[in-house]
Amino acid sequence: MTILNTAKRALHFLRIGLAAKKLQRTQNETERLLAKRALAGLFADARGITMKVGQLFAGTDGATPFQELVEGIEPLPLKAMIPLLEKELGQKVKSVFRSIAPAIAAASLGQVHLAELKNGDKVAVKIRYPDISDAVDAELRLVGLMPGVGPVNRWGFDLDAYKRSLRDNMQRELDYRSEAQRQDYFGRAVQVPGLQVPKVYMDLCRERVLVQSRAEGVLIDKAANWPERDRLAIGQTLVTTLFKSLFVAGEVHGDPHPGNVFYSHDPNGQALVTLLDYGCTITIAEQRRLALLKLIAGCRERNPTKPLDCFAALGFDSKKLSYIGGSLPALCQILFRPFLLNHPFNPEQWQLGQGVNDLLGDYRWWFRSAGPSDLFLLMRAFQGLIQQLQQLDVNLAWWPLLQQAVGRDLIERAMAYQLPAVELPTATALSFDQQAAKLCVRVTEGDEQRVSVAMPAEAVLDLEHLIPEDVLERIKASGKIDLKQLADSIRANGIIPRQLFVFEDGGKTYRVWLE
């Protein structure tokens, strides 16, 4: 890769950055659509890392311009790929394949051709683009020059670790032999009703070639119009697959953009999910799996488990987390809300970002900066699942599906798992059972009780909006109660049993406390 080509990649990066900024600032809907089309076009022209970023946009934006990235860009002609294929196989194409067709789809690192083996098996052949390795190296060098700015700089993100994680992941994706091995393992380890993992022909896989059984189906935009019975079955398969791959197999599919999943029906009419592209998977060590499962179960049962210890075992910086240790039990109630309900969970009602912001304020960046560099890939898998469930318009009960996927024995093993010791003051590490369960409000007038209500303790994060407007104005006017200081205290010390305030006005006494 010449200096000139590297400079060209840098210029393309710059154009994408400017187009993204223009899109962010555009208010008019027509202009916004045009800006999206321009940005999608730049992503599509780039291939490599840059197109992968575009595919991530496609996973978070259902609009047509980015959807085009999901379905692929213009592939290279077959005649341009045949010499590479023959070089990798070490023999002529006609010696292996009865037929091979022009590419049906192009992706960020390679393109897919439908073919038929000499024995009649129908397969899909993924061939890596010529010179794409050099292009990726150039882009990785550019990524290495990225400065720490904004929240990255202010809150001490380990940017070098994120760069290394990106580099390691991209280098692994470039080796199709590694992908074939991970796909083969996933297919054997993650056995889920309704899930199909294409068979890999290991003897035909090379560094730049992957051969697998042919998969057919439609994308999620079409499956979203199927009957509710099918959509529920698909949703259960997607959720169970993530849970089993994470907690049992320890290998999570980390590239959930819509083009990597086909939907179809088996001969009996049962809905099927075919998961494609195992270039980007996340390996989760057993300690981390047990720690996460213990964290979820502890949060659900409000037992003596200390979230800080679990997060540390997951790879978080425990010293950093100790500064917000009091907020961690409440934070888990927000992060793991889908697992805490005993009834079907509606993703549309999960105000995750708002909830974290209400609890931590700007310290949400502190929490994120404390996380390990590979966490964003796991978060991406969960984010992709939520988006798929939203598109399918299905609500599912997560905890029963988790129990079914991993089994009671593994949950009990996780709950009994002894976490590595964290050398920090105990005051900074609240456990779930130390957190308040209820926010209580009582209004009395003389000897008579006028109001007595109790609500989930987490409601304290929205305390100002719970207080009647006229009472709120009088509280602020009195100057006796600083609600902002109270909120800061809750963030620092956690949602623990305590009296919040007593306010007397007009013969009425307002008492608010956590218990």
Outline where the language-model segments fall.
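Short amphipathic alpha-helical recognition elements used for nucleic-acid or partner binding
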Residues: 291-294
